[in-house]
UniProtKB/Swiss-Prot annotation:
One of its GO terms (biological process) is cytoskeleton organization. Keywords: Leucine-rich repeat, Repeat. Coiled coil: none annotated. The keyword RNA-binding does not apply. The keyword Repeat applies. It holds the Pfam family LRR_4. This is Uncharacterized protein F09G8.5.
Length: 461
């Protein structure tokens, strides 16, 4: 067709030159145009006849005019190859990943799950570039959540998902393990995968111990089961050795330094009976021959006026090494009785040659003497002795600390060991008679009796 048009143009030029006329070339040009139009019509007709079976005519609207387009009548392409007709999930986010924040929306969740936020139980958002999951706080029934290969930085919205069982957060942007604190209140959480996050670092056992310490209910961490050994290491790592040592030392020092007020002093009216400066352990109970041999200077017997001595509950032991007798029990009554007994003994000045007998013991020598009626003293001794007998039958526990001079303990031991059963019975009868007579005395008379008893005690020593 193109060659024919060129041929007619050249022919009209030659005719105009040969005949030196203007009208003839115009006629030739008109003839050429009509001939070309006719040939074009024939060509289009033959083309339509051959291809009408394979093509269809579609009207495509363009504003107010219409144009005819010829489109293939074959089946439409698949969604994977035609992103315009079938948009992907990323078109439902607010913006592109490379430019601004990508926020998870309700419409995106609905496209994936075909249900409302309140009814979602499983949600897979792998590789969507999401960095805002605030909408997850509305998913109260959510059990399985996959957010791997995203840009999540905070787990705060997940603290409202109380039914969460599995959370997958691999390859995200978690900067600190403190974000796991938001998952502590999830009772059903058993599987967690946070590997390849900045907070993991190089990983290893230390990282696993930290995670297990925060979430002890986990059974699977980073696609690895959590064993009993992991739990033990997490517990041991949570209690530093220095803290354990300080706690043990503090408890031991409190036990050794605490002295009960009743063991330090006994008040009869305004008068202070006894004051103990440095405590030592006081033990009441049975003793064996081996113990008496090991501590001969620390063992003595206490003679209680008005009460018979028994072999089971009248022996007193002093020991300056608490570690060898941990577990012995000392009740308040026995300690108060000991303080009262020491207070009723007459004081003697310490001599230069007797200073070695006291060693590390320290008791005030200018202590006020006890002014107490003997009847009241007898009743007090009796009640204290009964309480001491009951206490001796109980299991041993930690006791209090008191002290007493070794020299006096030795003297008491000598006198108590030399007392015969007949003398004990006679002394009991005498004390009973004295108690009856003391009931007839007034306060002044009782004081005179106490003074006389103290003077005689000094003479006996």
């Amino acid at each position: 067709m193109e060659h024919l048009l060129l041929f007619l143009s050249c022919l009209s030029m030659l005719v105009s030159i040969a005949f030196q006329s203007v009208l003839l070339p115009l006629i030739l040009h008109l003839f050429s145009f009509f001939l070309l139009s006719f040939l074009s019509f024939l060509h289009f007709r033959s083309f339509s006849a051959n291809n009408f079976k394979h093509h269809s005519l579609f009207l495509v609207p363009k504003r107010r005019s219409f144009s005819i387009s010829v489109l293939p009548a074959a089946a439409p392409s698949s969604p994977s190859s035609n992103s315009f007709l079938f948009p992907s999930l990323s078109h439902y986010f607010y913006s592109l990943r490379d430019t601004t924040m990508v926020k998870l929306t309700e419409s995106a969740v609905y496209i994936r799950t075909k249900c409302s936020l309140e009814n979602v139980k499983k949600l897979n958002l792998w590789g969507c570039g999401i960095d805002d999951i605030q909408v997850c706080e509305k998913m109260s029934l959510l059990e399985v959540l996959s957010l791997s290969v995203n840009e999540v930085k905070s787990l705060a919205p997940l603290q409202h998902c109380k039914n969460l069982k599995e959370v997958y957060l691999r390859k995200n942007c978690l900067e600190s393990l403190d974000e796991l604190e938001y998952l502590k209140e999830l009772p059903n959480l058993r599987t967690l995968w946070i590997d390849e996050n900045p907070c993991v670092g190089e990983g290893g056992q230390e990282y696993r111990r930290k995670v297990i310490r925060v979430l002890p209910n986990l059974t699977k961490l980073d696609d690895k089961p959590v064993t009993t050994t992991d739990h033990q290491e997490a517990i041991e790592d949570s209690i530093p050795e220095c803290d354990m040592h300080n706690s043990h030392y503090s408890a031991r020092s409190n036990r050794s330094n605490s002295i009960d007020l009743m063991s330090r002093s006994l008040y009869v009216g305004p008068t202070v009976v006894d004051r103990i400066v440095q405590p030592q352990l006081l033990h009441f109970g049975d003793t064996s021959d081996e113990e008496r041999t090991t501590y001969p200077a620390r063992s003595f017997s206490v003679e209680v006026p008005g009460l018979p001595l028994t072999e089971d509950h009248t022996t007193v032991y002093l020991d300056s090494a608490p570690q060898s007798h941990i577990g012995s029990r000392h009740n308040l009554m026995s300690q108060s009785m000991y303080g009262t007994l020491c207070g009723t003994l007459a004081e003697e000045p310490s001599s230069a040659d007797g200073e070695d007998d006291w060693n590390d013991f320290s008791i005030e020598e200018d202590r006020v003497m006890v002014q107490m009626p003997l009847a009241a003293s007898h009743r007090m001794y009796q009640s204290m002795h009964e309480g001491m007998v009951i206490e001796m039958k109980r299991p041993p526990v930690y006791g209090r600390s008191v002290s007493m001079p070794r020299r006096r303990a030795t003297n008491l031991t000598t006198r108590a060991s030399s007392m015969s059963p007949a003398r004990e019975q006679r002394l009991t009868k005498i004390m009973s008679a004295v108690s009856v007579l003391l009931d007839e005395l007034d306060t002044d008379g009782l004081r005179q009796v106490v003074d006389e008893a103290q003077r005689r005690l000094k003479k006996q020593r």
